[in-house]
UniProtKB/Swiss-Prot annotation:
Protein name: Proteasome subunit beta type-3
InterPro entries in the cross-refs: Ntn_hydrolases_N (IPR029055), Proteasome_beta_3 (IPR033811), Proteasome_bsu_CS (IPR016050), Proteasome_sua/b (IPR001353), Proteasome_suB-type (IPR023333)
Taxonomic classification: Eukaryota, Metazoa, Chordata, Craniata, Vertebrata
Top-level taxon: Eukaryota
Sequence intervals crossing the membrane: none
Subunit structure of this chain's protein: The 26S proteasome consists of a 20S proteasome core and two 19S regulatory subunits. The 20S proteasome core is a barrel-shaped complex made of 28 subunits that are arranged in four stacked rings. The two outer rings are each formed by seven alpha subunits, and the two inner rings are formed by seven beta subunits. The proteolytic activity is exerted by three beta-subunits PSMB5, PSMB6 and PSMB7.
PANTHER family reported in the protein's UniProt record: METALLOPROTEASE TLDD, PROTEASOME SUBUNIT BETA TYPE-3
GO CC entries: cytoplasm; cytosol; nucleus; proteasome complex; proteasome core complex; proteasome core complex, beta-subunit complex
Amino acid sequence: MSVMSYNGGAVMAMKGKNCVAIAADRRFGIQAQMVTTDFQKIFPMGDRLYIGLAGLATDVQTVAQRLKFRLNLYELKEGRQIKPYTLMSMVANLLYEKRFGPYYTEPVIAGLDPKTFKPFICSLDLIGCPMVTDDFVVSGTCSEQMYGMCESLWEPNMDPEHLFETISQAMLNAVDRDAVSGMGVIVHIIEKDKITTRTLKARMD
């Protein structure tokens, strides 16, 4: 059994027109045993910037805390909010430092540039190799199912409501076909002037 599927979990980000969305499931379990249904996998890293972490639950929390520490240092030193691309480099450095005994988590970053409000999404593997795309990124135990749903439903230049509907349908239908993710989904829609957070009900089995 892979360490990456020990706790299960799924995270996804999608790009729209002047907006991005990031979604994650809410399950924390140990293989088939369910522990809790409100586990946090998406963490704020700025006013319009979020990171989603799927993988081993202990490493999800460790990476989130260490990243927050580095982010606070960066903002104190630079006196400004971090750009999404810079955060990607910061995460890549953090993960690559531990490449011989890696953090078992594959991050997904979604946000808007603090000055230009240009949408940005990317994913990284567990040793910090980044992949920046213009459509969607996925991470977690049901990544094949998520890729299938996203390839079918995603279209360019979606408005925030359309983007929410698309990411929600993709996420809910993907986690329904995975035994170790699900138990509800949390979705953040990031726009220039507001962030909308919605919690979706899903199958609880």
